[in-house]
């Protein structure tokens, strides 16, 4: 495992750039932080680089196993100092593991193949809220998520943290325009249910047996 101690190291700078959407798009990668989420990424086989906080390699058997699994998959491993880890992530107290992960995005047709209920998010602006909604959808057994154009970037660090790993195993189609979504829903026999506050049926009295696309609007 190579040691990195300089915040000016090109590898460190490239990873730190992933805090910005422009570079996430250019590199087709994003950051995943924390043992649980990094473990999910390793299990998915999509970790490109793994940064380990210096002095924590053997902090627990679980962490050691994650590092070993990442190495076996061919990920680049780096042991970094705390200043370097702080440079890479956007939190004041960085966790022991941070990974650069290959960006994954589903196509609408992949969601159609799964059937069931699809959650459609429209212009969700807060990264934390977006991540929480994806995590909730995953826990509820939703088959996939559609992010309409105008939603904040799901690969932003705060959004990724809020998903707590769910982003890595629930299909998410991003940047979909409304017209394409409606055309796709009609083509694949989806009933569209839109949430609202007034003059609406109760969620608990509504038949949501698939295929149904539930649209939730902005904050």
Regions found by a protein language model. Give the residues of each.
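RNA substrate-binding interface of SAM-dependent RNA methyltransferases
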Residues: 46, 83, 106, 110-200
């Amino acid at each position: 495992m190579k040691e990195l101690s300089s915040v000016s190291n090109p590898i460190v700078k490239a990873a730190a750039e992933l805090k910005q959407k422009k570079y996430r798009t250019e590199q087709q990668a994003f950051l995943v932080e924390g043992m649980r989420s990094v473990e999910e990424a390793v299990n998915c086989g999509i970790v490109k680089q793994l940064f380990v906080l210096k002095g924590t390699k053997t902090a627990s058997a679980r962490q050691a196993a994650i590092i070993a699994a990442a190495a076996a998959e061919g990920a680049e491993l780096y042991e970094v100092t705390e200043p370097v880890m702080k440079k890479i992530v956007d939190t004041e107290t960085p966790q022991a593991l941070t990974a650069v992960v290959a960006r994954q995005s589903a196509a609408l047709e992949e969601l159609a193949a799964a059937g069931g209920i699809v959650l459609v998010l429209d212009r969700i602006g807060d990264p934390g809220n977006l991540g929480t909604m994806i995590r909730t959808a995953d826990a509820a057994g939703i088959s996939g998520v559609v992010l309409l154009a105008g939603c904040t970037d799901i690969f932003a660090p705060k959004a990724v943290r809020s998903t707590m790993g769910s982003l890595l195993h629930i299909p998410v189609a991003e940047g979909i325009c409304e017209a394409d979504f409606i055309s796709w829903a009609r083509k694949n026999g989806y009933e569209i249910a839109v949430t609202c506050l007034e003059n609406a049926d109760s969620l608990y009295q509504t038949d949501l047996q698939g295929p149904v696309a539930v649209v939730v609007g902005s904050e």
